[in-house]
């Protein structure tokens, strides 16, 4: 819980700096937090069959925050670049899906494969962390490829709401 108390506000500040907009900064956090909550619920299933380390919730939070924000950042940044270049809403979303969507998929699969290696360590803590990490990465990846484009489509230009004037020049 202590790590989350530090990581969440810090992530929000960084995202505000990067995007210069409150709504654009909150979208990646929303996706990451949703992935964390979903994974914390889903971890109950494997915990019926294998021991789950008591620190798994912290691992899920920190990894989920990292990949959830990262995957959203790829997508949202690309969609905003396309809009700034004059593309319409749908064309911008399609371009983001074709480029950033593919990057999210490849990145997510790579992390899943790498984390699967810990399953063979023989150490119960590593196995537990591997399962939690793989689950949160998969949930964040699926959310980034499905929920995020739908959310951006629904938000449209409102993703720019809450612009922070002095940050406008930095993004």
Stretch-by-stretch model annotation:
Residues 1-171:
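Membrane-embedded transmembrane helical bundles of large multi-pass transporters/channels
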């Amino acid at each position: 819980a202590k790590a989350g108390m530090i990581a969440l506000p810090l992530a929000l500040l960084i995202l505000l700096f990067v995007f210069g907009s409150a709504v654009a900064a909150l979208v990646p956090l929303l996706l990451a937090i949703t992935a964390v909550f979903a994974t914390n619920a889903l971890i109950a299933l494997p915990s019926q069959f294998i021991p789950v380390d008591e620190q798994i919730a912290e691992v899920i939070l920190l990894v989920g925050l990292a990949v959830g924000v990262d995957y959203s950042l790829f997508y949202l940044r690309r969609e905003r670049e396309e809009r700034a270049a004059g593309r319409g809403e749908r064309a911008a979303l399609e371009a983001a899906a074709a480029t950033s969507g593919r990057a999210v998929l490849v990145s997510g699969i790579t992390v899943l494969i790498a984390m699967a290696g810990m399953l063979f360590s023989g150490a119960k803590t590593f196995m537990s962390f591997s399962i939690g990490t793989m689950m949160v990465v998969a949930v964040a990846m699926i959310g980034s490829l499905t929920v995020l484009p739908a959310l951006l489509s629904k938000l449209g230009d409102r993703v720019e709401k809450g612009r922070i004037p002095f940050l406008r020049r930095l993004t």
